[in-house]
Amino acid sequence: MASGGGYGDANAKIDYVFKVVLIGDSAVGKSQILARFARNEFSLDSKSTIGVEFQTRTLVIDHKTVKAQIWDTAGQERYRAVTSAYYRGAVGAMLVYDITKRQTFDHIPRWLEELRNHADKNIVIILIGNKCDLVNQRDVPTEDAKEFAEKEGLFFLETSALEATNVESAFTTVLTEIYNIVNKKSLAADESQGNGNSASLSGQKIIIPGPAQEIPAKRNMCCQAS
């Protein structure tokens, strides 16, 4: 289970650092989702991200302190040159579309293809339909997104950065899944350590993806008021 950490970095010892990337078209609310998670803030005057920025937040998962390093980039084509550096080292990804703009959902397969071309094959991915507070403007049926997520093996949630609906759940779902995968690797390594097959796993762990076990089946979650 994950428990909320401070908005800002705590002074506690960090056990893991997980890099998670936000991707999707411009103006779907990626930066707003990040601001809500990292600082519990929302601004109607938020400007489009130029280039790349990242923020951090610490959480406790299974009594371990995890620093989430969340990267946000512009969705515009002219900034696509940052691709390789942006995805390098990422162990989680959030594919974001706007439920009121069908085009942003229709572009998700392209973003997913780019992600899979540049990131580790075992990266944990969640599909996010943002702005679910705008019920009367919905242009993407929840079932369409659920079906796509199931077909591609992704987690799925609808969120509202404005109302803080499911934002925390989206991040903790990804981070907890990453932690579970890493923890299984650590246990396997500990078992082989007696045979001299593994280096010590003590101390801070900066998690970089590599060959790993298969990621378990994903869950689908829809927008619900907390």
From Swiss-Prot:
Entry superkingdom: Eukaryota
Motif (Effector region): 46-54
Primary location group: membrane
Membrane topology: Lipid-anchor
Cysteine methyl ester: modified positions: 223
Annotated Pfam families: Ras
Swiss-Prot/TrEMBL keywords: Cell membrane, GTP-binding, Lipoprotein, Membrane, Methylation, Nucleotide-binding, Prenylation
Prosegment residue ranges: 224-226
GO molecular-function term, one example from the UniProt record: GTPase activity
Record family assignment: Belongs to the small GTPase superfamily. Rab family.
The protein's name: Ras-related protein Rab11A
Species this protein is from: Lotus japonicus (Lotus corniculatus var. japonicus)
